[in-house]
């Protein structure tokens, strides 16, 4: 599918996210946290949901409460991702590039994602074949190429689509984590 088709789908999905009421977002974040036990002992590379993404702070707190080591991305000027440990909920996150909330801790570098045994990746949509539609900057496609860990795309339940356009450089995911369905894995 063309880059134009991906751009059109991104516009549609972003508009849908922008229309979600705050109460729905809050409920989605609380529901994601209920699935923390299904994510294993970690370490887990995750992210802080921003700009209409599924809220993940409650999930991160639930993982940390279980003693799971959580890594969060540090967005670089070239849109690549380094990683840092999220050490405590009471340590304020700082706003990085493009509004990405990230820990203050020392960087583990680009290869830091390799310390995770599971990756939770943001996405606008995903399909049952593991095709993930991101924001279009390539940050996660580059980062996911550096890990062998299973990857779950964190999306709203209605963002699991029949088909998502993909290009050769797009990194596949192994399943989804949604507020309503929890963890869903795809046949490999």
Identify the residue ranges that each predicted region occupies:
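Surface-exposed, charge/polar-rich loops and edge strands
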Residues: 1-11, 15-20, 65-66, 89, ...
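Glycine-rich, N-terminal phosphate-binding loop of Rossmann-like dinucleotide-binding domains
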Residues: 48, 123, 180
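Receiver (REC) domain switch-region micro-motif
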Residues: 44, 119-120
């Amino acid at each position: 599918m063309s880059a134009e088709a991906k751009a059109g789908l991104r516009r549609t999905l972003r508009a849908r996210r922008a229309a979600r009421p705050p109460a729905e977002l809050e409920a989605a974040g609380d529901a994601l946290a209920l699935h923390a036990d299904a994510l294993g002992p970690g370490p887990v590379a995750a992210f802080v949901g921003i700009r209409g993404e599924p809220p993940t702070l409650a999930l991160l707190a639930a993982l940390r409460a279980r003693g799971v080591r959580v890594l969060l991305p540090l967005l670089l000027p070239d849109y690549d991702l380094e990683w840092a440990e999220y050490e405590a909920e009471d340590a304020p996150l700082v706003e990085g590039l493009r509004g990405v909330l990230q820990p203050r801790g020392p960087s583990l570098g680009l290869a830091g994602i390799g310390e995770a045994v599971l990756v939770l990746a943001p996405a606008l949509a995903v399909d049952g074949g593991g095709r993930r539609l991101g924001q279009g900057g390539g940050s996660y496609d580059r980062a996911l190429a550096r890990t062998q860990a299973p990857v779950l795309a964190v999306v709203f339940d209605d963002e699991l689509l029949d088909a998502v356009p993909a290009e050769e450089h797009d990194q596949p995911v192994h399943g989804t984590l949604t507020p309503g369905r929890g963890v869903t894995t795809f046949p490999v």
